[in-house]
């Protein structure tokens, strides 16, 4: 009990010391660059309402859908331990078929073409 109490006391004191150092140590000299919001890849002093590529948005949504497919199919190797593995195989086949049909539709509509 004394060892646990001593460890808790040491951790509490160390946490307080680190919090005080973090409060008193930082350099407080703000300038315009430090006060402006940081936007990765964009000019921070320019307009925030620049046009956004719709093609990029569609490709990003497609990436998210297929990433979700991978997340749904990852537990598939453990499906053979179920009492009815054919049901898991049926669901897996239907998910892959649905996503493949969606990909074919997107391909025929020209959604995957970057340049027109």
Curated annotation (Swiss-Prot):
Record field: catalytic activity: a ubiquinone + NADH + 5 H(+)(in) = a ubiquinol + NAD(+) + 4 H(+)(out)
Compartment(s): Mitochondrion membrane
One Pfam match: Oxidored_q4
GO molecular function: NADH dehydrogenase (ubiquinone) activity
Keyword Transmembrane: yes
Top-level division of the source organism's lineage: Eukaryota
InterPro entries attached to this UniProt entry: NADH_UbQ/plastoQ_OxRdtase_su3 (IPR000440), NDAH_ubi_oxred_su3_sf (IPR038430)
Residues passing through the membrane, by range: 3-23, 56-76, 85-105
Keywords (A to Z) from UniProt: Electron transport, Membrane, Mitochondrion, NAD, Respiratory chain, Translocase, Transmembrane, Transmembrane helix, Transport, Ubiquinone
Cellular component GO terms held in the UniProt record: mitochondrial membrane; NADH dehydrogenase complex
Topological relation to the membrane, as annotated: Multi-pass membrane protein
EC number: 7.1.1.2
Broad class of the protein's primary localization: mitochondrion
Family, per entry: Belongs to the complex I subunit 3 family.
Role: Core subunit of the mitochondrial membrane respiratory chain NADH dehydrogenase (Complex I) that is believed to belong to the minimal assembly required for catalysis. Complex I functions in the transfer of electrons from NADH to the respiratory chain. The immediate electron acceptor for the enzyme is believed to be ubiquinone.
Name by which UniProt lists this protein: NADH-ubiquinone oxidoreductase chain 3
């Amino acid at each position: 009990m004394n060892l646990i109490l001593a460890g808790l006391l040491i951790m509490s004191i160390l946490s307080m010391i680190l919090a005080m150092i973090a409060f008193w140590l930082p350099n407080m000299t703000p300038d315009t660059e430090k006060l402006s919001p940081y936007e990765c890849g964009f000019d921070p002093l320019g307009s925030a309402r620049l046009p956004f590529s719709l093609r990029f948005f569609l490709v990003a949504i497609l990436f998210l859908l297929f990433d979700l497919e991978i997340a749904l199919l990852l537990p598939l190797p453990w499906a053979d331990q179920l009492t009815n593995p054919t049901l898991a195989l049926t669901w897996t086949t239907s998910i892959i078929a649905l996503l493949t049909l969606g990909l074919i539709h997107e391909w025929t509509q020209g959604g995957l073409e970057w340049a027109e």
